[in-house]
């Protein structure tokens, strides 16, 4: 299967490419075209690439962010080819929780991944979230055991406290 992911030049994550999980699972990654400003995706180029390679997944979100991502427009491209949209919010999740960065799920992303420690301020770890019950059930079925090897109660308690802080003080 094919996926489209931002290139490293705009902060696309290695796990979405051949050297990371995508490659380990036999996925073919096509680099998303970058806009002329060098900091966002070229929507027309993305649409043309998606029509040509028919990806199962389009990932967006990257570590170099000067502007919000056009999630709704990317979702429209994904819908045209039957792909899902994954927003990598590792660097934005604290700003999303605080209400100063748009919520990718509300804008149309099917999935959002995030670090629990970078801008969120919790313990080391990560989360995958979705508003789609079917996707949530599929993820739950492969998460443990499968994609993860353990469940750390202490880390979960620390994360719960961080999330309570965001609920009470973040927005």
Predicted regions located by residue number:
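Conserved PLP-enzyme active-site core in the AAT-like
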Residues: 1-171
């Amino acid at each position: 299967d094919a996926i489209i992911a931002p290139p490293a030049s705009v902060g696309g994550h290695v796990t979405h490419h051949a050297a990371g999980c995508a490659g380990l699972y036999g996925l073919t990654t096509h680099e998303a075209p970058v806009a002329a400003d060098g900091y966002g995706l070229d929507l027309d180029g993305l649409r043309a690439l998606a029509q040509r390679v028919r990806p199962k997944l389009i990932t967006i979100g990257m570590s170099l962010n000067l502007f919000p991502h056009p999630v709704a427009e990317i979702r429209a491209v994904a819908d045209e080819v039957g792909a899902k949209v994954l927003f990598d919010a590792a660097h934005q999740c604290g700003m999303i929780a605080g209400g100063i960065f748009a919520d990718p799920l509300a804008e149309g992303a099917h999935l959002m991944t995030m670090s629990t420690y970078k801008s969120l301020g919790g313990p080391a770890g990560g989360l995958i979230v979705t508003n789609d019950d079917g996707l949530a059930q599929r993820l739950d079925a492969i998460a443990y055991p499968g994609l993860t090897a353990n469940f750390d109660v202490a880390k979960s308690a620390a994360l719960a406290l961080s999330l309570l802080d965001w609920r009470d003080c973040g927005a």
